[in-house]
Structure formats: structure tokens, C-alpha cells
Amino acid sequence: MAAGGGGGSSKASSSSASSAGALESSLDRKFQSVTNTMESIQGLSSWCIENKKHHSTIVYHWMKWLRRSTYPHRLNLFYLANDVIQNCKRKNAIIFRESFADVLPEAAALVKDPSVSKSIERIFKIWEDRNVYPEDMIVALREALMDRAASHNARLQKLQCFPGTTFKTQKQLKENLNKQPNKQWKKSQTSTNPKAALKSKIVAEFRSQALIEELLMYKRSEDQIELKEKQLSTMRVDVCSTETLKCLKDKTGGKKFSKEFEEASSKLEEFVNGLDKQVKNGPSLTEALENAGIFYEAQYKEVKVVANAYKTFANRVNNLKKKLDQLKSTLPDPEESPVPSPSMDAPSPTGSESPFQGMGGEEPQSPAMESDKSATPEPVTDNRDVEDMELSDVEDDGSKIIVEDRKEKPVEKPAVSTGVPTKSTESVSKASPCAPPSVPTTAAPPLPKPLSTALLSPSPTLVLPNLANVDLAKISSILSSLTSVMKNTGVSSASRPSPGIPTSPSNLSSGLKTPAPATTPSHNPLANILSKVEITPESILSALSKTQTQSAPALQGLSSLLQSVTANPVPASEVTSQSTTASPASTTGSAVKGRNLLSSTQSFIPKSFNYSPSSSTSEVSSTSASKASVGQSPVLPSTTFKLPSSSLGFTGTHNPSPAAPPTEVAVCQSSEVSKPKPESESTSPSLEMKIHNFLKGNPGFSGLNLNIPILSSLGSSAPSEGHASDFQRGPTSTSVDSIDGTPVRDERSGTPTQDEMMDKPTSSSVDTMSLLSKIISPGSSTPSSTRSPPPGRDESYPQELPNSVSTYRPFGLGSDSPYKQPSGGVERPSSLMDSSQEKLFPDTSFQEDEDYRDFEYSGPPPSAMMNLEKKPAKSILKSSKLSDATEYQPILSSYNHRAQEFGVKSAFPPSVRALLDSSENCDRLSSPPGLFGAFNIRGNEPGSERSPSPSKNDAFFTPDSNHSGLSQSTAGHLTLPQTQYPDSPHSVPHRSIFSSQSTLAAPAGHPPTSGVEKVLASTISTTSTIEFKNMLKNASRKPSDDKHFGQTPNKGTSSDGVSLSNLTQPSLPTTDQQQEEHYRIETRVSSSCLDLPDSTEEKGAPIETLGYHNAANRRMSGEPIKTVESIRVPGKGNRGHGREVSRVGWFDLSTPGSSFDNGPSSASELASLGGGGSGGLTGFKTTPYKERAPQFQESVTSFRSNSFNSTFEHHLPPSPLEHGAPFQREPVGPSSAPPAPPKDHGGIFSREAPTHLPSVDLSNPFTKEASLAHAGPPPPPGEHSGVPFPPPPPPPPPGELSSGGTGVPFATPAPPPPPVDHSGVVPFPTPPLPEHGVTGAVSVFPKDHSSLLQGTMAEHFGVLTGPRDLNGPGLNRSRESLSLPSHPLEHLGPALGGGGGGNTSSSGLPLSPAHRDAIGRSGMILRSPRPDFRPREAFLGRDPFHSLKRPRPPFVRGPPFFAPKRPFFPPRY
């Protein structure tokens, strides 16, 4: 410790440029100036610790100044040393203890002065108490302080007496002196440490039982000694007495005495031996007692700490209570409050206030109102509304439930169109823009020209029957609040159409379209809507009661209202009159043309409307499992917010029940599509570019790297153009792209910043809508259930959706659709796929999903880029869904149309569009799927046009091989479409796809547009789609794919799938059913498949669905999820994306294989139960859960098994199947299933596959997936269309993977895709699988999911084919599974047929497969999922799922999708 040495070391080690001399001078200065204040001591102490590398120099100078200073200053230096010594360990500078230990003995001798010795002694005591230094060291210090100080000082003086010695010599002598105590201390440390170690060892090894045994032994020996003592005392011979010897007189006496003496001596000897033993055993007993003393003392200390902690806590609580009581006393009297609280039944707040606070009774209105606000983005109000919405989870739930009830009633009315109108009405009442209510009154006959009219015609009557469900008081309060809002906003009621005036789709479309722009500028969208609609208790009642009789006109009115509000003018009538005529569409188209972007949107809207009714219906159905017709209600919502291509498309899908309305819509959409499509076409490239540029220009989006097809495909351009209308209402949702495609912050709707979008639903309107939807949806316990509220929510959703769509679409018109589809659409389709209930729910879930999706998309704009790729996935999903059932086709068609209008159609030449349009009417269902396929592929094709889209499409496909495959299979219906697809990627492929979809639809009852193509497509598409869906389902619930071959029915009959659909949705026309079912299935697939699916699952429906569907996973955050739904638009985006990313993580963790294997392993049943989707969910959720809560995984499994089962058992005989579904909140209900499957699929496939996508897509999975998908963006689509089908061979592996569910099932029906055929949907999945799924997906997955994917993924992807089966059904699986269960069994029974075996590998072949397939295929038809939804809520309540909340950030999709930087979920919750 020489000064020189110290300086040298200081120089050498000093990080600063200062020299050793500078350090020493600084030390001298600091030590000299230190005072006894805490600031001075702690400051210098911190400085010393920071400069720990100079510890030796510091200690040396400390000692130097200790010697030179006066006693008071020495005390200060000791205080400093104490502070350093005690804090050095905590600050990783323990070296100071050793350094000071060297000098402390000498230092202690320098502070023996009575004035400071007591303080020094106290420091030593503290060190002793805190075990800073060993006891021996402390003793030595005390000795130095007291006695040795004198001798030590004498030695020092002796040193100083040699003037001849140099400073160095003196220093060495001092060091020698200091080293002695140091050595002693070190010795003592070594000797003391063992003691401490011994103590800790004793405490660790102490066994109370050993002590007890020792004590018992001692007691026994004591007893023995006592006994011997007594024996000795009873001896007649006193062995020790010599007197007895004197008494001996004769020999006899002597012998007797001798004998007695010997006995006595032997006993005495025994006694002595016993005592010896006791002495020997004593030490061990003593040691045991000592150890026990140490042990119990240590325990006592710990207990004391805990007890003190509790005491402290209790004191703090008491203090806090006192403070609160004091504050409470200062609060004014409730009566004296300047702003008295509203009464329990007071209307919800309006204007800038959150319309959700009074959601309870007003909820039906709120969604629409919120949607309207979104449509006419209210700068601050909207955001606040969203936030309020998020805040009022409970209220929202309550209102949702109410809406659900209402919806259920309307749903009960099995009128396809009716369901839609009801939804429209409900939506209107919710929105309180009540144009819908008036519309219901007015529009009932006009809009649903074909099916809708008939179904809707009873609307007036239906209203009253539903009165029981309606709270008139609440409605009145809502109306009054709406009125006040309108008054506040100063919106003229003149603009609103008379409630009694029926509006033709054209009228509403054109009229509303015109208002939409006006609405957009309006600061209070809600007010605008209200101003447009005369709100009367009757109107709201009709809306709330979901009068299904409200014919298309009513829907039209509402939808037009919503559209105008949404800036998505496609009227419900267009939606409703899918097959009706081109005139409404034309009108819409012309009107749309006025709003270029809108027109595209509208086109999509009609399509989506087409499905929308179904969607609404689905939601309604979800609401009431028994209401198969609820699908109609969604028509309006579909129109309203189905505008978002995805959402719209899926909503459309949900229109299975209202097949006619979709048909009507198809007609409208046809012409509308043809009109808007050109615009879209023209705008698509620019939109794509704009979106692409927008995303590119927005680092936030790129950072999020969400695989949002909308984002990628729609980019900013698509949103700007395609969403002009949407934006008007959607600007609030996400960053609004100016019409020219420049991202613009739309202050009107309080458009959040990109960060906000990431964090927030992105579009206040969307959020609000989603929240509303959620609120409305709360009725449905599960996400599906929640979605179920969609009737009310559906309306809200349409409005919301448009908002969200706007939000969503801003990221890519064309892509939007695809993306949305996966997200909302997919989930919806899933729901649709599931069954009536699912149908009902799907819309519900999907609409919510879509809303959320939109939010998410708002949030995920960055994701949009990825979504470009995903977009295709969406498309694919759509296609898959389409395949799944013709019923999905309408939605697909709608979606496709939307996509086309947005991006796909735009991408397609007018002729193609015409083809699509023409196809759309008859082939609407099939065509849209084709479109989806096209979109998926086409989305890619537009992607072709806008390169990223296709790539991503492919990537989307690839990541969602299942979905991709399905989509492609569906789109191309593999073989036929494949060729066509290649033929005219835009026109023919779409057409072909449509055709095949149409064919699917045709088998169901829709005439195929292209005879051969359609037929082939139908067969292939049905089979492929179904199989693909099954595959998806299987993939989703890979382990469960055996069980969950909901696909089997699908597979069982390519057309069987259609049949199943029909069976499942008897109320729907076969074609419509199939279409819707397909659509639903597709929706589900999309959801699960795509990022979007993830997002759908997790974003859109999943939020609720997640909440519910992912109950185990997410919904646990269940309630939060509701909030999240509203709040997490970005979150959803995140979530969806995040989910995918998460999924990637999870998928990676669980890896698709793992996820499926793990999740589905455990989720196998789950998947089976949940229908694959659940499995997927489980897989993906399970995986996370495994990570997070393996028990949850089991829980998930269990949850699915039990919870879902109970939830579903009523729907699904196979509780395991149901299991998966519950897990997939969404799967629970048809609606639920899609999200779940999406989750599964999205999670495992969608999320995981999408994860893949995200992984591949995000972590540049696109490299992998892009390599697959991107490699030949258009080709992959083509391949998907063609290759996937051609790749049916891979399906066999998937079949194998599928647990034979796919493989065997495949073989059964698989003409082109034999293996997949089994699943019906599997064929599609299979080809895609082979191409993307197996080749791409597997490769992608393997890439993404590495080995897991390779094997597992292969399996998974095979399973995608198989599990896809599960996923198809899984995707739809749970949902379908869930919904399908009742019908599924019958469907599945036959459909399952051969496929059933494989499908039911996990669950009973007949049952599970039937379930699975039925679920997968018809699952949505099954309303049973509805209960699931409810149970899901329970699931939401479940903690395991609660963990999902966190997982959602993972859903954020890990790094690739780190989507919103802040997952946004955590904060929301």
C-alpha cells in the first residue's frame, strides 16, 4: 500500500486521464474536508465506492488522514469508513471491506479517546450485528480500541524515534504493523466463517424428527436407570456396608450373603453401565439440542421479520385509511356535488363524453354511435370515447350482454336477411344514428330483394317479439342521450333519412355516400349519424329487438347510414342483394366512384355486407345459439363496417344464415364491385404504392413490421384511396392516409399518432366501435359470444368496422381486405365456419375482431407492410374459408370484392372485375373466395402490381400454409382455380377461385359461375377448402386434428363441406350456408392463419375472442381483452401481429409443431376440443402457457376440455373438441372458433404460421415465407391456387401429420387432394401446404420454427394439412367445432366419413371427426359455440387465460411484430 504503489496502481487503472498525483491530491482534499453531515459522508462514500479500483490508495489516504486529524475528525473519517464498508457489498465493491480490514486495527487504536470511543464502539457493534466482520475481527478491534491502543501507539512512537529512517522505511514498518492484525483477522475470518457456515448447515440440515428421536432415546435411558435404581434400593444386601460382614456367623450365612452380594453387585454394575451409556449419549443429545436451538432461533428471527413486516404493513394500511378518512371528510356531500352523478338509468354520456359509460342500456346505440363517430372521426371525442370504452369494461360487458340478448331473439327469427336487418337495427339503435331503426322499418322490404326480403319481411313483427329483450327505458335514455349529442354537435336532423322512409341500397348508398364525406368532416360522427337518423324508442327498439323482419331496406338504411357515416356507402341492400342485381351495387358503385376510395371500399362492403348480414347474423347467432338466422342482422353491420375489406369480407361470411341477403349483396356488389373495382384497380397500384410508401415512410410501422396485409397491401395508398370513405370515418381509427396516400393525421376523428395508433385501437372510432362491439358483445361471454353481441355490435361493428376498416384499410385497400379478413374476416369466417352460432358469433367476434383488427391494423400499420404478405394470407384464409363453406364464399366474395375494389379488384382488369362481379352474384360466395384466393393471391397479385403484397401474400400463405394453402386451394380451389389463377391472376384466377368457391356455393345451392371451373373449383374448393380448413384446424389443433376433423365433414364431401354447411346452416340456403360456412371457416382460417388471423383472433375477435376464445390464453385477460379490444386496436394489431410474433415466439417456443404438438399435444384435445383452432390456440397459447403456465396449458387443455366442454358440450358432443374451442374463446362460438383457430392457426399457424409469417414475415419470415410466397408472389398465389392443389400430395403428409385425420381423411375424398379431401378443406390446405404449407409453410415454418416446424411444422404443416384440418375446423375448428358439434356430428358423421377417422384420431372418429369436421365445416352453424362464448367469458375469468393478457404482448408478435412498441395490452389492462 505504498504511496508510490498506490499512485502507480491509480495511474495504471485509472479510467480517467487524471494522474495518480491528481487522485491523491483529490483524496487528501476530500478526506481533509469531510464533515459529520450525512450529505458529506454519503457523498464521499459514494465517490469512494465508484472509484473502487483505487481502493488501496483510498484506504491508505484514509489512514493517513486518520493519523493526522484531531479526534473529532477521526470520528468523521470512521463514519466515512463505516458508510463505505456497509454499502460496498451492495454496490459491488466488497473489496473495500478487505482493504479497510487491513488498517482498522491500527485505526481503532487511534480513536480510543473517550470523546469518540463510544461512537466508535457503536460502529463496531453495528458491524457485529450485521455480520460485516467476523466476531474475532470485532474482538480484535475492540481490544485495539481499549487496551492494545497503548502498546500500538508506543510502537508507532518508537518508529517515529528513528530520525534516520526514511519515509519508505517507516511506511514499511507501518504496513508490517498493520499486517499482523490483518492476518489475525483473516485467520479469525477463516475460523469464523466455518462457524457461520456450520450454523447455516445446521439450519439447512436440521430435522426435527432426529431431535425427537434423540430425546426419546434419552428418556428411555433415564427410565431404565430409574428402574435399576429402584431395584438396587430394594436389595436386602447393602453391598457397600462392611458391617454386614461382621454379622456373618456361619458358612451358610456366608454363602447366602455371598449370593446376595453378587446379585446386588451385578445389578449395581448394570446401573453403572447404564449411566455410562447416558454419559456417552449425552454429547450427541446436547449437540442435537444445540442445533435445535440454533435452528429454532433462526426460524424465530425469520418469523419475527415476517411478523414485523405484517405489523408494519398493518400500520401503513391504518395510516392510509386514516388519510383516506380525512380526505373523505373533506369531500362534499353527494347532494351538494356541482355535477351530480347521473341516475342508474340515465342515458349514457354523449358528445365528447364517452358514449360507453352509459353502455348498460344504451349499448346497442353506443356501438353505432361510436362507429359513426369513427366514421366522422371526432378528433378528441373519438379517442376519448375509445378510452372510455376501454375504461368501462364492465358497463360494456353488460350492454354487450343486453345487445346479445336482443340479438339472440332476433337471431331466433331464422331469417337470413332478417338477422341482418336486426343487426342493422340494433346497430342503429346502438349507434343511435337509428337510420337503421328507421331503415329497418323502411328498408325491410326493399333491400333484401331475394332472400332478405322474404326473411326480412317479418321485420315489423319481429321487433315486437323481441321487446321482451329490449329495455325500453334504457333505449329511451339512449335516445335522449343521442338526441342531446346531436343537439350538442349541432348536426341537422334534416340530413338524416326519415326512419320510415325505406331506402333502396342505391338510395342509401348514393345518398349516404354523399353524407359520408359530410359526416367525416363532422366532429361528432355519432351526432352526424344521429342527425341522419331519427331515433325513436320504436326505432331503437326495433333495432335492439333485432327485428329480423327489418328487410334489406332497413338494413340498407342502417347500412347506408353506417356507410355514409363510415364513408363506406355500400348499402346493406347491396349487401343484402348480393344476388339481387347490379343496380344497387351500381348505385353504390357510382356513389363510390364519387368517392374513389370509398367506391372500392363500397364494393368490398357490398361483398362484406353480403357476408356482413351473415356476420351480423353470426354475431346474433352467437348471441343466441339457437338463432341460426341471425346471420341476417350482420348484413347491415357488414355493410357498415364490413367495408373494411377484411372485416367486410368476413362479415359477409357471417352471412351464411342470410344467404339470400348475401346473394342480394352479391348482385349489388357485382355491379358495385365492377364499378368500384376499376377505381380500385386504378387506385390499387397507387394505393398499394401509397400504402407501401406510407408504411415505408413511417418508421413506426416498419418497426412494428406487422404482417398486416392491409398495412402492407393497403399501405397508405390503399387506405387513402380505398378508404376515402372509410377514412372519413376511419381516419380516427388509424393514421389516416390522405386521399393521395399521404399519411395524414386526421384530427377530425382525433386520429391518434402512429404511436398512439400502436398503443391505441388506432382509430378512436374503431376503438370506440370495438369497445362498443365488445360492450355489446359482452353478452356473449366468449369472444364469439362477445361477438355475438354483434347484432348490436354488428351494427356498431359495421360502423366500427368501417372505422376500423377505414383504419384498417388505410393501410392497404386491397390488402386491407385480406388483412382484415385474416383478422376480422378470418375470424369471422371462422365463426361463420363454425355454425349458425358461429355465424352469429363470427360476426360478433369478427366484427369485434375486425374492429379491433382495424384498431390493430391502425396499430399495425407498420405491420401493414408485413401484412402485404399477410394480406394474401388473409386472402388465402378467405379462400380457405371459402372452401370451407360456400357460406363463406359470400364473405369471401365480399371480401374479395372488397379486396378487389381495394386492391385485388383494382389490381384486376375491369374485365376480370366484371368476371368477379358476375361471378360474385351467383358465385359471390365462391367468387369472393376466389377473390380472396385471388386476394390472398390476388391481394398478392395486387401485390404483384404492388410487389410486396403478393410476396406477403405468399408469405402469408406460407406462414399460414394452412391458410395459405386453404386460401389458395380455396382461391384456386387448387386445381381449377389454380389454372385459372395463373390464367388471369386478377381476372381468371379470381374468377376461378370464385368459381370454385362458387362451385362450392353451387353445391350448396349457389349456381357456379363457371360451370366446369366452378364445379371443379367447387369440388376442389369445397373439398380443398374444407380439407384446407380442416388442415388449418388440424394445424391449429394439430394434436387434436385427429379428433377435430371438423374438416372431415368438409373433406368428407368436397361438396359435402358445402353440404355440411348446408346441414349446419339449414336455415341458410345450401349454397349460402356453405358459402357462409365456407366463408366463416375461411374467416376463421384467415384469422388463425394470418397475422391478421392472429390479430383477428387476437386482434379482432380474439380480443374478445382472445378474451373469450383465448380465455385460457388471452381472455383471462378476458375482461381486459374486452377493453383491449377497444383499446387495443393497435394492441390488437399488435396483438394480432404481436400474436403472430408471439406466436412466432410461441410457435417457436411451441413451434407450430410444438405449439401444435405441445399445445395441441396438450392442446391436442384442446385442438380437438376447441377444434384445432383451440388446439392451435392451445398450442400457441399452451406454448406460451407452457412457458408461462404449463398448468395453464393443461388448463387450456383442461379448460378446453372442461370449460370448453361444458361450454360446448351443449354444442359439441365431443367435449375435447369443445375444449379447444373454449380455449379459443372464439372457437367457442362459431365466432369464437375462428379467432381461436385463428389463434391456433394464427397462433399456432396463424399466429404461429403467421407467426411464421411474422417469423418468416416479420423476422423476415417473408424471406422464408416470402421466399415461398414472395419467391413467386403471383406464382405462389397461383401455386396456392394451383400448386397447392397439385400439392395435394403434401396433404397426405399433412394427413399423416394430421394424425391421419388429414391423411386418412384426405385419402377418402381426395380426388385431387385425396389426403386432404378427407378433410374436405384439407385438400386445399394440403396443396398450399405442399406448396406453401408443406413446402413453403413447412419450409417457412421450419425456418420460422426451425426444427420444430420442420418436423413438427412439417407435421404441423402437414398437420397444417391435417392440423390445418384441425385448424380449418380448428381455425374454424373450435369455432366450427363448437358450432358444428350439433350439426357437425350429423354433417361430420357423413362428411367425416372417411375423414372422420383421421379427424377423430384424437377424439372419437365419428364424434370428434364429426365434431371436428362439423365444427370445422359446419361448426359455425352450430350455435353451440355460442354457449362456448359464454363459458369463454368464464374462461375470460379464468386465470390461466388471464395470463394471456401478458402473452398478448407476445402476441404482439415478438420482435417482428413488435408492432406497437408498447404492446398496449398491459397498459390497457
UniProtKB/Swiss-Prot annotation:
<feature type="modified residue" description="Phosphoserine">
    <location>
        <position position="995"/>
    </location>
</feature>
<comment type="subunit">
    <text>Associates with the RNA polymerase II complex.</text>
</comment>
<dbReference type="InterPro" id="IPR047885">
    <property type="entry name" value="RPRD2_CID"/>
</dbReference>
<dbReference type="InterPro" id="IPR006569">
    <property type="entry name" value="CID_dom"/>
</dbReference>
<feature type="modified residue" description="Phosphoserine">
    <location>
        <position position="684"/>
    </location>
</feature>
<feature type="compositionally biased region" description="Polar residues">
    <location>
        <begin position="959"/>
        <end position="982"/>
    </location>
</feature>
<feature type="compositionally biased region" description="Low complexity">
    <location>
        <begin position="576"/>
        <end position="591"/>
    </location>
</feature>
<feature type="modified residue" description="Phosphoserine">
    <location>
        <position position="1117"/>
    </location>
</feature>
<feature type="region of interest" description="Disordered">
    <location>
        <begin position="1204"/>
        <end position="1328"/>
    </location>
</feature>
<feature type="compositionally biased region" description="Pro residues">
    <location>
        <begin position="1272"/>
        <end position="1295"/>
    </location>
</feature>
<feature type="region of interest" description="Disordered">
    <location>
        <begin position="919"/>
        <end position="1013"/>
    </location>
</feature>
<feature type="modified residue" description="Phosphoserine">
    <location>
        <position position="788"/>
    </location>
</feature>
<feature type="compositionally biased region" description="Low complexity">
    <location>
        <begin position="1400"/>
        <end position="1409"/>
    </location>
</feature>
<keyword id="KW-0488">Methylation</keyword>
<dbReference type="Pfam" id="PF04818">
    <property type="entry name" value="CID"/>
</dbReference>
<feature type="compositionally biased region" description="Polar residues">
    <location>
        <begin position="1047"/>
        <end position="1073"/>
    </location>
</feature>
<feature type="region of interest" description="Disordered">
    <location>
        <begin position="716"/>
        <end position="867"/>
    </location>
</feature>
<feature type="modified residue" description="N-acetylalanine">
    <location>
        <position position="2"/>
    </location>
</feature>
<feature type="modified residue" description="Phosphoserine">
    <location>
        <position position="583"/>
    </location>
</feature>
<feature type="modified residue" description="Phosphoserine">
    <location>
        <position position="374"/>
    </location>
</feature>
<feature type="modified residue" description="Phosphothreonine">
    <location>
        <position position="782"/>
    </location>
</feature>
<keyword id="KW-0007">Acetylation</keyword>
<feature type="region of interest" description="Disordered">
    <location>
        <begin position="572"/>
        <end position="594"/>
    </location>
</feature>
<feature type="compositionally biased region" description="Polar residues">
    <location>
        <begin position="761"/>
        <end position="771"/>
    </location>
</feature>
<feature type="region of interest" description="Disordered">
    <location>
        <begin position="1368"/>
        <end position="1414"/>
    </location>
</feature>
<feature type="modified residue" description="Phosphoserine">
    <location>
        <position position="738"/>
    </location>
</feature>
<feature type="domain" description="CID">
    <location>
        <begin position="19"/>
        <end position="149"/>
    </location>
</feature>
<dbReference type="InterPro" id="IPR008942">
    <property type="entry name" value="ENTH_VHS"/>
</dbReference>
<protein>
    <recommendedName>
        <fullName>Regulation of nuclear pre-mRNA domain-containing protein 2</fullName>
    </recommendedName>
</protein>
<feature type="modified residue" description="Phosphothreonine">
    <location>
        <position position="617"/>
    </location>
</feature>
<feature type="modified residue" description="Phosphoserine">
    <location>
        <position position="749"/>
    </location>
</feature>
<feature type="compositionally biased region" description="Basic and acidic residues">
    <location>
        <begin position="370"/>
        <end position="386"/>
    </location>
</feature>
<feature type="modified residue" description="Phosphoserine">
    <location>
        <position position="504"/>
    </location>
</feature>
<feature type="modified residue" description="Phosphoserine">
    <location>
        <position position="781"/>
    </location>
</feature>
<feature type="region of interest" description="Disordered">
    <location>
        <begin position="489"/>
        <end position="524"/>
    </location>
</feature>
<feature type="modified residue" description="Phosphothreonine">
    <location>
        <position position="742"/>
    </location>
</feature>
<feature type="region of interest" description="Disordered">
    <location>
        <begin position="647"/>
        <end position="686"/>
    </location>
</feature>
<feature type="modified residue" description="Phosphoserine">
    <location>
        <position position="495"/>
    </location>
</feature>
<feature type="compositionally biased region" description="Acidic residues">
    <location>
        <begin position="387"/>
        <end position="396"/>
    </location>
</feature>
<feature type="modified residue" description="Phosphoserine">
    <location>
        <position position="919"/>
    </location>
</feature>
<feature type="modified residue" description="Phosphoserine">
    <location>
        <position position="492"/>
    </location>
</feature>
<feature type="modified residue" description="Phosphoserine">
    <location>
        <position position="1086"/>
    </location>
</feature>
